[in-house]
């Protein structure tokens, strides 16, 4: 299975564009790492820089590595939007409920 996972507000805190200040959410990272360990392809997908044009790739890669977030790919091409409607989405709050 190929699983796309958002970063901000999903595996770390939301920082309103101050991405260097993001704090990891370890229990959420562990849950995604389990999916990785089970053989799923994990792609972290973020809209960092989509409005400003700033390239956050290196900082984001460093954060994922420091946080121990296992993944196969990092994609920074997620568009900025206010609402996402899709037949395959899962709300992160529902997904990470214990």
Descriptions of predicted regions:
Residues 1-98:
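Catalytic phosphate/metal-binding cores of nucleic-acid and nucleotide-processing enzymes, i.e., regions
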């Amino acid at each position: 299975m190929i699983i796309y996972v958002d970063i901000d507000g999903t595996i770390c805190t939301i920082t309103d564009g101050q991405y260097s200040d993001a704090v990891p959410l370890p229990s959420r990272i562990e849950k995604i790492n389990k999916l990785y360990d089970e053989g799923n392809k994990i792609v972290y997908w973020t809209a960092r820089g989509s409005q400003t044009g700033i390239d956050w790739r290196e900082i984001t890669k460093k954060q994922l590595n420091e946080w121990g977030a296992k993944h196969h790919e990092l994609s920074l091409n997620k568009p900025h939007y206010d609402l996402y409607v899709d037949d395959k989405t899962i709300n992160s709050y529902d997904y990470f409920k214990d």
